[in-house]
Every structure is written in C-alpha cells, then in structure tokens.
A protein has these predicted regions:
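Conserved N-terminal beta-strand and adjoining loop/helix that marks the start
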Residues: 1-18, 34
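Active-site-adjacent beta-strand/loop module that shapes the phosphate/pyrophosphate-binding cleft
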Residues: 3, 13, 69-108, 118-135
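Amphipathic alpha-helical recognition patches that constitute DNA-binding helices
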Residues: 6, 43, 82
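Conserved Nudix-box catalytic region and its N-terminal flanking loop in Nudix hydrolases
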Residues: 16-54
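Short aromatic-enriched loop/helix-cap "lid" or pocket-rim segments at secondary-structure transitions
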Residues: 31-32, 79, 115
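A short coil-to-beta-strand element that immediately follows conserved catalytic motifs
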Residues: 59-69
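A short acidic/glycine-rich loop-to-helix N-cap element
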Residues: 109-113
C-alpha cells in the first residue's frame, strides 16, 4: 500500500490554515494541504515534519504535530495519514514548488472547484474543528 501524509497547519490565532496551490495534475491550480509520500521504512510523524520543513520551512520548533486520522482507499492501495498543528509563533514561509497561501478557516473547504480531494479537505478540517472544540480550543 502506498502511504502519503497531509498536514493541516493553523496560524497561532486559529483564523487561517495553510494551503498550497498545486502545479501538477491531478488538481492542477487547486488548493491542497501540504504533504507528500511516506517512505516505507520511515516513521510517519518524522515524515510529516520532513515534508512540512521541505515545502514550507516550518519545523518542529514552530509547531507540534498531532497524528489525527487515516484515510484509506483500499481498492486503490493508498493510505493517507492526517496530521494537524497550531503554530506557536509567526513564521516566514519558504515555498519549495507550490505557492503557499493562508486561507480563512471559515472558507468552504468542500468547494470542489477550489479545493482538491473531492471534499476530503472539508471533511478533515471539520473533524479537526470538532476535536479542537472538544479540547475547548475555539476556532
């Protein structure tokens, strides 16, 4: 099974989340979460931090990531590990390939004309909002 990760990054004030604008198909020109492939022998959390550092310049001193959920596409042989975190300070983003953009947390992440993944980004962010509200962290 091929493994991937996606990372939901919230600004410290929780008003915006970080998106990248895809430059390749599938979903070319659409917003997506930061993430990438997980090497088979590597730990998922370490791979999430590695991808985040490579694609944004955000590192473990800037954010603590939480392993939140998996999405599995059994017939496609694909598994996606979902992580999230809240920045503990303002950061200077450095784009690797894809343009990075902060998006208002109240945007419609289910908009399939704007966001990649057939509504998965909306589902992921709504589930994280529930988790944060359960921890008395209000968005």
């Amino acid at each position: 099974m091929k493994k991937y990760n996606v990372i939901v990054v919230f600004e410290k004030d929780l008003n915006r989340t970080l998106m990248c604008k895809r430059t390749k198909e599938p979903y070319k020109g659409m917003f997506n979460l930061v993430g990438g492939k997980i090497d088979k022998e590597n730990d998922g959390l370490n791979e999430a931090y590695r991808e985040l550092q490579e694609e944004t310049n955000i590192n473990c001193d800037d954010i603590s990531l939480i392993y939140f959920m998996n999405i599995e596409y059994v017939t496609m042989g694909k598994s996606i590990e979902v992580y999230y975190g809240i920045l503990n300070k303002d950061v200077c983003l450095v784009e690797e390939v894809n343009k990075l953009e902060w998006v208002d947390i109240n945007d419609n992440f289910f908009d399939m004309n704007k966001y990649a993944g057939e509504g998965n980004i909306g589902h992921i962010i709504e589930e994280i909002k529930i988790e944060l509200n359960n921890k008395n962290i209000n968005l």
